[in-house]
Design a protein with these regions (language model features):
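Glycine-centered flexibility motif
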Residues: 1-2, 42, 100, 132
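Non-catalytic C-terminal accessory region of glycerolipid acyltransferases
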Residues: 62-175
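Catalytic core of membrane glycerolipid acyltransferases/transacylases, capturing the structured
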Residues: 2-58
Length: 175
């Protein structure tokens, strides 16, 4: 019920599709404006009303934060990758989360849903050939009451740790 922010680890171009395919209700996402103008990506962004963030424009970044926070507070669901990018063939390694990514959650006072993506990088961002099974794990939401007194870096660390723990748990279970 209501809006919330989804914060997954970022593995590659397939991530948004994997999440949107498995998510039970409509949602949108925030992405780098420069990468949003390629064929099909532009149309997909327009279709789901994604927000295009200019990474080198702090003023526009504040505008996007405010717009998304307002929409989330009004009930919309958004995906934002706090790593800010991904590496080719990343082998399920989670990079540092950018603390500023969590300003939207704080501003909207919405729940945070950590998402652990596993093997998503293999679809478009590796040399893997053949069928691939990817995993999307929606972790227990973190309610505003749980993080309201925390700094954005503390929230980023909390979400990252939960995602890393889930990935480790799943990797051990599938050995």
């Amino acid at each position: 019920q209501g809006g919330y922010m989804m914060y997954p680890n970022h593995q590659g171009k397939y991530d948004v599709l994997g999440i949107m395919y498995t998510h039970k209700s409509p949602c949108s996402f925030v992405m780098d404006k420069r990468k949003s103008h390629t064929i099909l990506v532009r149309e997909f962004c327009d279709l789901v009303q994604a927000k295009r963030l200019e990474k080198d424009n702090p003023r526009q970044g504040i505008t996007i934060i405010n717009q998304v926070a307002k929409e989330v507070a009004a009930g919309k669901k958004y995906i934002l990758f706090p790593e800010g990018g991904y590496r080719f063939n990343n082998k399920n390694k989670v990079c540092d989360f950018k603390a500023g990514s969590f300003k939207i959650a704080l501003k909207s006072r919405a729940p945070i849903v950590p998402i652990a993506l596993i093997d998503s990088y293999k679809v478009f961002n590796s040399f893997h050939i053949g069928p691939i099974t990817t995993y999307v794990h929606y972790l227990k939401p973190i309610c505003y009451e749980e993080y309201k007194g925390m700094k954005t870096q503390e929230i980023a660390d909390l979400v990252k740790i939960r995602i890393e723990e889930k990935i480790q748990q799943e990797m051990q279970a599938h050995k």
